[in-house]
């Protein structure tokens, strides 16, 4: 009974939760049913407290659904039960194995002869069966999913399954180091893996400009056009670098149109929303929005922890949960910063032979942590929010309850919880001596509104970017 009941719960939770969240917190739980009491065993106190805090209501709801009137009492314990609980089957390693395929295939993905790069270049048709510059290490299987990138990942998967027909073009935008480039490569690899003769080209926008200049210098612009207009998928990173390059924009405009007419996939990334890219023609910006435009947000706490745990696992390093949380709570801006910090911690541990503890991390990252703590303060958050919403600081800290003041105040409280290490009572004190329960309510309300309101989600993301830059 316990096996089938908990397996039902696991399967439903796996459907409802981001994969990184499920794998980290729910999958390790074991279950035992005795005397109508369902005991869930967690590997340590940290996981137990987290599960009970975050998922208790969801688990109780599922038990109510599956058991009707005969609902078992739910208990939590640290440890493991005598007999192993059934596990949800893990994803296969087929995609990961593909990343270590034959050297010839790797070379084909990473290099390609471009016929306009030398004088007297001939037709390009013979050179099109390649996977140009697609990095085989970046797959969907090693992309850590979270609420911040869930829509972007889902769209990228759809495009890789149906290139040229689902979301064309796909435009991903967001700050530096959030995973946009990883998704570009993942799409390229997925297309190539399902169709080995697909012609997929990944490049930075500056490389497109450089290629066009070489083609003009070598009197080979027609070869350049045929090359780029004959690919099955064109993946261009950092499209904002086309700004103020009129000839490049002109050529890309015609290439863009030709690819769309041929149902060939286009994926673009930028550090900002298409209409906010200065120096790019309106006709191009309009076309960028013809398909699907998706924001990639800075990772939330749970995703940052999952990223650290995944990277530590890749390095075959054990990283304790509390250490991962210590790092994730203090480094919030992007994935690249997290990975760089973890690499520094691992290098220091290897050099010194010391265990990776919170004290060790505090020492290894002291300059980085000091900078972060100096950059983001509650006072800074309050001033930024007040300026963003064009309200007075005095009103933000007052007892006024009108929505024009209360909502920015709640946002500022939620941001203070997210971006600083202050406790709820300390945050409450900073907002006019409010109780910690008021701060907790504000955090929960903003979390709810970010799911329901596009405007609140956009405001929150804009403020995060401003405060983290």
Curated annotation (Swiss-Prot):
| Pfam families per the UniProt record, alphabetical | Bac_DnaA, Bac_DnaA_C, DnaA_N, Hda_lid
What function is annotated for this protein?
Plays an essential role in the initiation and regulation of chromosomal replication. ATP-DnaA binds to the origin of replication (oriC) to initiate formation of the DNA replication initiation complex once per cell cycle. Binds the DnaA box (a 9 base pair repeat at the origin) and separates the double-stranded (ds)DNA. Forms a right-handed helical filament on oriC DNA; dsDNA binds to the exterior of the filament while single-stranded (ss)DNA is stabiized in the filament's interior.
**Sequence segments annotated as region (Domain II):** 90-132
Is DNA-binding one of the keywords?
Answer: yes
Share what the entry says about its subunit structure, partners included.
Oligomerizes as a right-handed, spiral filament on DNA at oriC.
What organism is this sequence from? Aliivibrio fischeri (strain ATCC 700601 / ES114)
Tree of life domain: Bacteria
- Could you give the domain comment from the record? Domain I is involved in oligomerization and binding regulators, domain II is flexibile and of varying length in different bacteria, domain III forms the AAA+ region, while domain IV binds dsDNA.
Family according to the record: Belongs to the DnaA family.
Q: Which InterPro entries match?
A: AAA+_ATPase, Chromosome_initiator_DnaA, Chromosome_initiator_DnaA-like, Chromosome_initiator_DnaA_CS, DnaA_C, DnaA_dom, DnaA_N_dom, DnaA_N_sf
| A single BP term in Gene Ontology | regulation of DNA replication
- Supply one GO molecular-function term: lipid binding
Name where it's found: Cytoplasm
Q: Where is this region: Domain IV, binds dsDNA?
A: 350-469
Region Domain III, AAA+ region: which residues?
Answer: 133-349
Please verify whether the record's keywords include Hydrolase: no
Q: Which GO terms describe its cellular component?
A: cytoplasm; plasma membrane
Alphabetically ordered keywords of this record: ATP-binding, Cytoplasm, DNA replication, DNA-binding, Lipid-binding, Nucleotide-binding
- NCBIfam families in the record, alphabetically? DnaA
Q: This chain belongs to which protein, by name?
A: Chromosomal replication initiator protein DnaA
């Amino acid at each position: 009974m316990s096996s089938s009941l908990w397996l039902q719960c696991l399967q439903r939770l796996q459907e409802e939760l981001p994969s990184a969240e499920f794998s980290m917190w729910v999958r390790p739980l074991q279950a035992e049913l005795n005397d109508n009491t369902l005991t869930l065993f967690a590997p340590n106190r940290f996981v137990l407290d987290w599960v009970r805090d975050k998922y208790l209501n969801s688990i109780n709801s599922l038990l109510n659904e599956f058991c009707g009137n005969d609902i078992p009492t739910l208990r939590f314990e640290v440890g493991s039960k005598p007999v192993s609980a059934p596990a949800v089957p893990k994803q296969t390693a087929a995609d990961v194995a593909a990343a270590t395929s034959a050297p010839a295939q790797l070379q084909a993905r990473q290099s390609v002869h471009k016929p306009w790069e030398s004088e007297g270049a001939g037709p390009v048709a013979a050179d099109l069966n390649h996977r140009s510059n697609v990095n085989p290490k970046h797959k969907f299987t090693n992309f850590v999913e979270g609420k911040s990138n869930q829509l972007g990942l889902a769209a990228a998967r759809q495009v890789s399954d149906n290139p040229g027909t689902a979301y064309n073009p796909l435009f991903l935008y967001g700050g530096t180091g959030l995973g946009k480039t990883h998704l570009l490569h993942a799409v390229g690899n997925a297309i190539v893996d399902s169709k080995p003769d697909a012609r997929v080209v990944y490049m930075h926008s500056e490389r497109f400009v450089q290629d066009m200049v070489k083609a003009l210098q070598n009197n080979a612009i027609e070869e350049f056009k045929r090359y780029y207009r004959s690919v099955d998928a064109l993946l261009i990173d950092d499209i904002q670098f086309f700004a103020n390059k009129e000839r490049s924009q002109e050529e890309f405009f015609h290439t863009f149109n030709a690819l769309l007419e041929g149902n060939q996939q286009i994926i673009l990334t930028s550090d900002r929303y298409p209409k906010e890219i200065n120096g790019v023609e309106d006709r191009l910006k309009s076309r960028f929005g013809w398909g699907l435009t998706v924001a990639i947000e800075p990772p939330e706490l749970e995703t940052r922890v999952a990223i650290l745990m995944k990277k530590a696992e890749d390095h075959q390093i054990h990283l304790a949960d509390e250490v991962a949380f210590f790092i994730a709570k203090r480094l919030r801006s992007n994935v690249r910063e997290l990975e760089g910090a973890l690499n520094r911690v691992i290098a220091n541990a290897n050099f010194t032979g010391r265990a990776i503890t919170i004290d060790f991390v505090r020492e290894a990252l002291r300059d980085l942590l000091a900078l972060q703590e100096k950059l983001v303060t509650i006072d800074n958050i309050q001033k930024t929010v007040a300026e963003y919403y064009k309200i007075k600081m005095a009103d933000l800290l007052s007892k006024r309850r009108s929505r024009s003041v209360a909502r920015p105040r709640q946002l500022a409280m939620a941001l203070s919880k997210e971006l600083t290490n202050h406790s709820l009572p300390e945050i409450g004190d900073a907002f006019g001596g409010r109780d910690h329960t008021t701060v907790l309510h504000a955090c929960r309300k903003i979390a709810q509104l970010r799911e329901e309101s596009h405007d609140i989600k956009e405001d929150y993301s804009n403020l995060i970017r401003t405060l983290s830059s």
